[in-house]
Amino acid sequence: MSSERAQFAAEVAEVERWWKSPRFARVNRPYTAADVVSKRGTIKINYPSDVQGKKLWKLLSEHAKNGTPSHTYGALDPVQVTQMAKYLETVYVSGWQSSSTASSSNEPGPDLADYPSNTVPNKVEHLFMAQLFHDRKQREARSRMSDAELANTPVIDYLRPIVADADTGHGGLTAVMKLTKMFVEKGAAGIHIEDQAPGTKKCGHMAGKVLVPIQEHINRLVAIRLQYDIMGVENLVVARTDSEAATLITSNIDDRDHPFIQGSTNPSLPPLNNVMVEAEAQGKTGDQLQAIEDGWIKAANLQLFPQALAQALANEGASRSTVEKLVARVSRLSWPQAVAVAQKEFGLKQVPYWNWDAPRTREGYYRYQGGTECAIHRANAFAPYADLLWMETKKPILAQAKEFAAGVHAVHPGQWLAYNLSPSFNWEAAGLNAQDMQAYVWELGKLGFVWQFITLAGLHSNAYISDLFAQNFAKTGMKAYVELVQSREREIGCDVLTHQKWSGADYADSLIKTVTGGVSSTAAMGAGVTESQFTSKL
């Protein structure tokens, strides 16, 4: 065997040993270690995000063992990241927030993932570079402390693992892999990716969501894992499903999606698209077209195929219990499988009219009936390829979270779950009292939701203090700044009160003095710096 072949074989064996570690006990890969090694370069690169990924895995493993959650929120900037580091274990980077505040094109907009694909990775880098800087700054400051000062000054872990929003992957499988590579290079410990179609992606709490087939999303998850493996990192992937509230799907090609696709049960209706094209040709627009579509949908009596089969069997005289058994038997079967079972096992004589093509939209999408059962079905299909599973929901309903967790854990015991504590929910109108709200994240933790996050808390907290301060500053001038900001910073011990020190001026002085032999007449924090005023109230 040539030395090149021997080196290749040795690396393959190393990857195979790596995959047998507890870290990947629940991970399924449809490719081999040789596939991975053949796609690597000859220079081994060590990525800081791998350290962060391992740290995140260890953190969540401990929470899973204890039935507790790690909860966080979406950070906008380095200021928020440094303040979060004192109290929270992870950092979230939101695509929604990036879309409105940090697009790499500088063009803001809603959460449609129509910003350049490097937008969220760039925000991750922005925050990760700040984490690294404040970690260095702290270490330098502690190196100058006495033993007593060290003992009385808690260490802040600025290097909190970052989990970021990969939307739908921004394109095909190679686009997903390139996006994943950017996230690894920029410092993300993990990413989440959702099962929406890329061209029509919406915020999880908007209408009009279009799903992709189950296998298409599995392919995305596999692409992420493959890219991780090629780079030799243990970063995490979160599989999100938007199927709880989805109403459309791009294709009926995947048998596993069949039970949730709706069809027309009215044989007298022409296809909806034909009706709409004809109406447009007649000059109808806007509300007129919407009324025509609404009327067609009502007349079509859309049903899932198991429902149509159940009605047909009942019409043929079957008992209620027999019909219920049929529904239970075919509820997760493909269309041809359901027909075969209904005929052979239940004696159905006539297959009912049921047409899933007739209601298709002008874009060609199929009508889809989402819900919690659907989300469980999809999550269970994604589980072997993801580290965590997330069902996007419309409201903070603990009973629904319990149903989802039970449905997943019945198939995949111990599977880690994630939960969006969304600010899109009207929490005050959710039927939760103050005690319920305080306990919510910990109750979810008991169910296996080991990682939870408020996607836009950074945005909302920023908006809140900005509005409050601007309003009062306009009326009362510096009194507003002192009362709402400076005195409150001092009261809670916020380190940004002394913003020169927070920004690293002492650290920069130390760098300069290291270069110049310990003396600098231009030290930023020398005599005359106004920050010395903050040693006491004026």
Curated annotation (Swiss-Prot):
GO terms for cellular component: glyoxysome. Its cofactor is Mg(2+). One of its GO terms (molecular function) is metal ion binding. Mg(2+) binds at D165. It catalyses: D-threo-isocitrate = glyoxylate + succinate; (2S,3R)-3-hydroxybutane-1,2,3-tricarboxylate = pyruvate + succinate. It comes from the Eukaryota. Catalyzes the formation of succinate and glyoxylate from isocitrate, a key step of the glyoxylate cycle, which operates as an anaplerotic route for replenishing the tricarboxylic acid cycle. Required for growth on ethanol or acetate, but dispensable when fermentable carbon sources are available. Also acts on 2-methylisocitrate. This is Isocitrate lyase. The lineage of its organism: Eukaryota, Fungi, Dikarya, Basidiomycota, Agaricomycotina. It comes from Coprinopsis cinerea (strain Okayama-7 / 130 / ATCC MYA-4618 / FGSC 9003). Homotetramer. Residues 98-117 are annotated as: Disordered. Substrate binds at S94, G95, W96, G204, H205, R240, N420, L421, S422, P423, S424, T455.
